[in-house]
Structure formats: C-alpha cells, structure tokens
Curated annotation (Swiss-Prot):
Entry GO MF terms: DNA-binding transcription factor activity, RNA polymerase II-specific; RNA polymerase II cis-regulatory region sequence-specific DNA binding; zinc ion binding
Zinc finger residue extent: C2H2-type: 170-192, 198-220, 226-248, 254-276, 282-304, 310-332, 338-360, 366-388, 394-416, 422-444, 450-472, 478-500, 506-528, 534-556, 562-584
Protein name: Zinc finger protein 221
Residues annotated as transmembrane: none
Amino acid sequence: MISPSLELLHSGLCKFPEVEGKMTTFKEAVTFKDVAVVFTEEELGLLDPAQRKLYRDVMLENFRNLLSVGNQPFHQDTFHFLGKEKFWKMKTTSQREGNSGGKIQIEMETVPEAGPHEEWSCQQIWEQIASDLTRSQNSIRNSSQFFKEGDVPCQIEARLSISHVQQKPYRCNECKQSFSDVSVFDLHQQSHSGEKSHTCGECGKSFCYSPALHIHQRVHMGEKCYKCDVCGKEFNQSSHLQTHQRVHTGEKPFKCGQCGKGFHSRSALNVHCKLHTGEKPYNCEECGKAFIHDSQLQEHQRIHTGEKPFKCDICGKSFRVRSRLNRHSMVHTGEKPFRCDTCGKNFRQRSALNSHSMVHIEEKPYKCEQCGKGFICRRDFCKHQMVHTGEKPYNCKECGKTFRWSSCLLNHQQVHSGQKSFKCEECGKGFYTNSRRSSHQRSHNGEKPYNCEECGKDYKRRLDLEFHQRVHTGERPYNCKECGKSFGWASCLLKHQRLHSGEKPFKCEECGKRFTQSSQLHSHQTCHTGEKLYKCEQCEKGYNSKFNLDMHQRVHGGERPYNCKECGKSFGWASCLLKHQRLHSGEKPLKSGVWEEIYSEFTASFTSVSLCGRKAI
C-alpha cells in the first residue's frame, strides 16, 4: 500500500526538483519555503483530523525529499505500516561511496502516530516539521565526515533554517502567534493575506492552495477503498477504518482522567471531557440552546430550518441526521447486528442492547420520586416524568393536537398524510409505524413473546404487558380532577373524563347514534351488518368484538387471573375484582347521576346489539 503522502506526490500535488543522475545542480538555492504549502487556520479547520495528519505528513516528506535530492532517491518500499503504536515509519537511505569507500546512512526518526481523530493545530504541525527538520539537518552535519567537498550542495544545508528549540523568537503581529523557526514564521505570515484562487466545482468552496482543494474533493468523489473484514463496511480513509475496527475488538485506548471511561477515538474523549467542565461553546442563535460540539449545533439547527437532507432510497423518508437514516435502513434490510449474549436476542442499536441487558440483571437505576417507579434507561425515566407534569411540548400544525414525545407526533402526522410506509408481507396491510407492523405480524404467526410472571399470561406487545401488570400491582398514576378517581392508563382517564364533559365524539353514520369510545362504535356498527368476526373454537359462538370473545373463553378455561390481595378470592375479569375490592375498602361507586348515564348508555348499546342480532337470525 502506498502511503497517503506518496499518493499526493504521485498525483502531482507536491512536486520537487527533478533528479538527473546522481546529482542535481541548482541555479538558485532551494529552501524548504520553496516547496512547502501553507493552510490558514480557517482552511485547516475545514479538514478532518485524518486530513490534518495527511497534511503534516506531506510537509514532513517535502523537506525529507529536499535533504535527499543530492543523493539517490529513497525507495518507496521502505514504508512500513506499524499498526497501533506508530503510523508510518520512513527510512531515508542515501548511499554514496566516496574515495574513502565510506557509506552514508541517514535515518529519519519515526514520526509518532496522531490518533485518528486527534486535532492538530497549525502551530503543532509546523512545530513538528521544524523539530524534525532540525534533527535531519543534524544527522547530515554529523555524517559530513563521509563527504568530500562538492558532494552535497552546500547551499541546501546553508539555507535550511536552524530552529531555536527552547525559544520562540519569531512573533506574528497579526495573531500574536510565536514560532521557533524563521522559515515556518515566513510561511505562516502568508496565511493572513492568502488569496483563495482554487474553487471546488461541486460546491463552490474556495481554497488558497490546490492540495487543500484536492483533499476536499475526495468528499464529493465518495471513493471508499478501505473495507472492514468483519462487517464489510467501507471507509474513504484508513484512519476511519482503524477507529471503526475498535468497535469489533472492544478496544478503547482513550481514557478520561476524571471518571476513567474509555473511548474508541480521541475526538469522542474530547467531547466527553466537556461534560465534566460544563463547557458548551456552540450556541443556537434561534433559541439560545448551547451544545458541546459544533456537529450537535448543526443537527439542532435543522429543527428550526426543517431541513432533512438524508433521504431513504427505498421509502423516501427523510431524516435530519445521517445516523437516523442508517438506523432506519435496517428496518428495510432486517439487519440487527447487536446480539444479547444471555438470551440471543438481536437489536439494531447498541443503546437498545445496553437497555435490554439490564433486564437480565434487573437493575433499574432511575427512580421516580413521585410514584417510586424504576426505569432501566434515562430516556424512559424522562418520558415518564411528563406523565406527572402533564407536559406536551410537541404540537401538530394540522389539527393542533399535542403530544409528549416527538415520535408520537411523527406517527400522528402520518394520519394526515395518509402515508403507510410499512407493509405486512402476509396480507399487504399498511401501517404508519414499524412497531405496529411488527405487532400485527404476530397475529399471523401467533407469537406472544411477552410473558406476565404473576399469572403467566402472554402478550404480543411489551406495552400490553406493562398495562396488564398494573392490574397486579394496583398502580393507578392517572387521576381525574373532577371526582378524584384514579386509572391505570391515560386512555381510560380520557374515556372517563368524557362522562363529566358529556362528549361523544364517535358517531354512527347509519343511525346517527354517538358514543364516547371508538370500540363502542365498532361494536355498534356490527348491529347494522350482522357481522360476527370472532368465533369461539369450542362452542362456535360468535361475537362482534375480540374483547367479548376473550371474556367468553374464560368460561371454558375456568381462568381467573385476577386475585384479591385481601382475601385471596380470584375473578375472571378485572371489573369483577374492582367491584369486589370495594367491599374491603368501603369505597362508594360513582355518583348516581353519572352511574345512571353509564348504565343507560350500556343498556341502550346492549339492547341495540340484541335487536340487531334477532333481526339477523
């Protein structure tokens, strides 16, 4: 493999005086300044860390070639990749046999590796160059006993600047930066008045020097010549591949000095360290929110602009962040690269695997101070707290409906657009979200992976299991402000509040009758059609709702999953348990007026079902 610096040399970005034979005669003395390329701090800031390292390597190689032009050029095959501790090692061998038969061997010191994401500033790069330049010059000076007069162009050695290692006497009047080498100082001064004459044809970005333009153009070319042997992922820079491979090996060489946490890259460590210092230097001009990293600010600003530059080629869905597009793409491919070692379950995201792992160790580090409920991850804890505060910060611009979470708003907005991007392969039914499609697919295969440890009941969705478990725990976090009644689920509270307000938003188009719940409307509509979709396999009795079928099947199975903690009596239905518990608590049912309204509505609905059933017969 040819080194990045040699690649630049071969592409014509950096050119040196041609060597004719064994010696080169210069009409004018060649200095390092003549072959160096300088970036301004602004231009250098546009390069990623790997490109900065490449720039540094090119500059180092410039003066190495300058030192060796009086001798045979060094061999390309003397470059060796050293892996973790050192990046490139170059042995520049110049051999000349004088009359004394002596041999000259000049070995440049190994350039230490910069971490794949280490931020090299202009000053650091040029100090490294100046330091290596001085070492190389001393090597020639120490080996001068092997040369005869005229063997090496004296002008080169004479014009190579000698660095002041301990001092920095050269100070820039523009930016007050100091330098130890006069050549580096001269080159730096050019950066303040540099004309940007090299323009990118793709995006119009301008640069002072052609090498900077060529490095930038690789972003548009999209060339990815470095491939991971483990997962096949491709990268356009070898340093990015090295960082990625640490994900597979688990290597985290960059440790935080305060908390000891390890990271794959130095840039990730630098971002983490700002958590300890509280530094957030990047501020949003729209809302004033501050961020640790500039990339976080750029992603946040897209919320204000509405920009979603990352589009899925399969379904056309757009995203603000590339990582979310990558995560979304796995929905179409079915890829789940993160596997739980305990139960073998696979996940699309490492964070989901980490959250799942806590299920096995039963650790719930985040506790709600109001209700005492524990949570595995902080995100779920923050979501839960909105239940108590009633906060709903996400508004639908179409209908004004508010939501606690952005994901719920996104799902709701698809109702207005009518877009159902997730199709069931079995029956072709469309769904707004992948989770709903996954839940639906379990109706085809009968899978119920979520099991209640109390009563052994199985559920298709985790949410259904969590709702069911509240029956056993007695948890009722949702309170009615009108009558003080508490409920286990927000949907039950909403339905109950309609009794106080008298709201009946669900209307039958056949007879005009209105209902407080959509399920009541669906059950009522079967009266007009006479349809009974749900059949009992044991007695073949038909029902117009699955709920009624489930209730009926308990008659055959003798199932009584609801137990009274006071006396141990068991019941087939939660409503029967609730009524029974009032005997122990002395709780009175709803006020007569409200109860009469519920009863009249129930009997009317029941009567209409019965009448329609008789007509169907």
